[in-house]
């Protein structure tokens, strides 16, 4: 009974500390670095953390059965739904260092349980260099170190979902791999405000159970942590991904120009294309600016990606398995893309009320435009259509752990010559979410 009471008291102490601890995927809970008079009393559980959050929500779409990136597509005969978007529990353990106040090792395990099933979201080990406290090594299943929006935890993200581009190019945000990080822990170090990550990953993420080829994704990111000047702060980063996957056939489609001047896909059917690597290459830049006031804060975020993405005729989504149809590999389509995310966050009256504005776009094929898509002989498909989403939202913070989120996402698509896309689709979504974190 005594042990149970001690564990319960420790759990309460831990969760109260961790409410604002871990904002980004694969980061270490900052409360592990806190020294106080309580921890020595309950040493057995002092380095264990249990955290989590739950997001029940109700949604209404503008039509039945729409394809949506606001928590997934709707059923064919439904335009409203209750759903448990996320319900996650995370267990973390830090092994104290004998030579410094920083951990020597850190382990994290996170599961997500909803009406759609239970899945592992994080499982990784992080080892720290404890002599100069500048380097760390991470291995396992963890967040890809690319961009700001991808790495911002859904426990803290203001709008209900990440942008369409994030979900297509980086489905489920995480991957299996290993990463080296440079992040000086000593605040006196001139580079303590910078973090550099360099990792090697399978590439398929959580959408596949194993690597379907031997090609790995090299991902790197340099990030400048918030630089503060009075009530103003600015931060930003640069990201790079270099990877790809093997062609399953000799047919590789690339952008070109037809005899009549139209943008088209031209097929290369050289036998040597089989098992060659279809390039996957991303470049990204992001910036975050924040101004604090006595009654709240104003924040602006901007992020831009561009690069090359392999796919099939029907999709530009990063695959979890080798794309096939009826057991036969599909031809590869090489597209050049760009996209961006913009956030504007504004407290109203006080910190309990927050206005949200968001705009994002994803153009999967910047070489083609509008009425070119759908013309006979171009080999262009709905996978080449540009989409943009404008979102408006409101958050009411009941307390530090509970908030209500109301948002409305308005989706627009390119008007093309493609049947079904000759006008704007009706695919807007209203979301009402209750968010609780512990």
Regions found by a protein language model. Give the residues of each.
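Bacterial Sec-dependent N-terminal signal peptides
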Residues: 1-24
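Outer-membrane beta-barrel biogenesis signature
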Residues: 19-51, 62-71, 249, 401-402, ...
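Outer membrane beta-barrel
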Residues: 39-63, 70, 74-206, 212-219, ...
């Amino acid at each position: 009974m005594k042990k149970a009471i001690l564990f319960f008291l420790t759990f309460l102490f831990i969760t109260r500390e961790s409410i604002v601890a871990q904002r980004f995927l694969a980061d270490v809970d900052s409360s592990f670095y806190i020294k106080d008079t309580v921890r020595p009393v309950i040493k057995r559980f002092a380095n264990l953390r249990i955290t989590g959050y739950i997001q029940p929500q109700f949604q209404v779409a503008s039509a039945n059965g729409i394809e949506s990136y606001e928590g997934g597509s709707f059923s064919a005969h439904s335009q409203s739904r209750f759903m448990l978007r996320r319900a996650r529990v995370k267990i973390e353990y830090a092994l104290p260092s004998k030579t410094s106040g920083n951990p020597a090792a850190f382990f994290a395990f996170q599961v997500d349980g909803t009406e759609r099933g239970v899945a592992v979201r994080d499982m990784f080990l992080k080892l720290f260099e404890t002599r100069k406290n500048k380097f760390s090594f991470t291995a396992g299943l963890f967040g890809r170190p690319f961009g700001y929006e991808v790495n911002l935890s859904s426990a803290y993200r203001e709008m209900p979902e990440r942008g369409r581009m994030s979900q297509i190019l980086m489905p489920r945000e995480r991957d299996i791999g290993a990463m080296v990080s440079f992040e000086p822990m000593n605040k006196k170090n001139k580079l303590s405000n910078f973090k550099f990550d360099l990792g090697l990953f399978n590439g398929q993420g959580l959408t596949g159970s194993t690597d379907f080829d031997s090609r790995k994704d090299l991902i790197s990111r340099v990030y400048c942590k918030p630089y503060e000047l009075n009530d103003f702060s600015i931060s930003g980063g640069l990201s790079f991904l270099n990877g790809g996957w093997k062609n399953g056939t000799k047919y590789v489609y690339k952008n070109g120009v037809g005899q009549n001047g139209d943008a088209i896909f031209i097929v290369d059917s050289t036998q040597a294309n089989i098992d060659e690597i279809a390039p996957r290459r991303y470049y990204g830049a992001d910036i975050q600016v924040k101004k604090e006031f006595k009654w709240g804060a104003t924040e602006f975020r901007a992020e831009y990606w561009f690069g090359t993405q392999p796919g099939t005729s029907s999709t530009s989504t990063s695959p979890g398995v080798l794309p096939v149809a009826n057991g036969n590999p599909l031809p590869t389509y090489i597209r050049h893309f760009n996209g961006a995310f913009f956030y504007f966050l504004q407290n109203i009256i006080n910190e309990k009320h927050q206005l949200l504005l968001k705009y994002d776009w994803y153009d999967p094929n910047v070489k083609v435009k509008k009425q070119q898509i759908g013309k006979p002989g171009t080999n262009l498909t709905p996978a080449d259509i540009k989409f943009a989403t404008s979102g408006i939202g409101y958050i009411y913070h009941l307390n530090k752990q509970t908030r209500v989120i109301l948002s409305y996402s308005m989706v627009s698509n390119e008007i093309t010559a493609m049947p079904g896309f000759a006008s704007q689709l009706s695919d807007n979504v209203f979301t009402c979410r209750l968010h609780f974190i512990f």
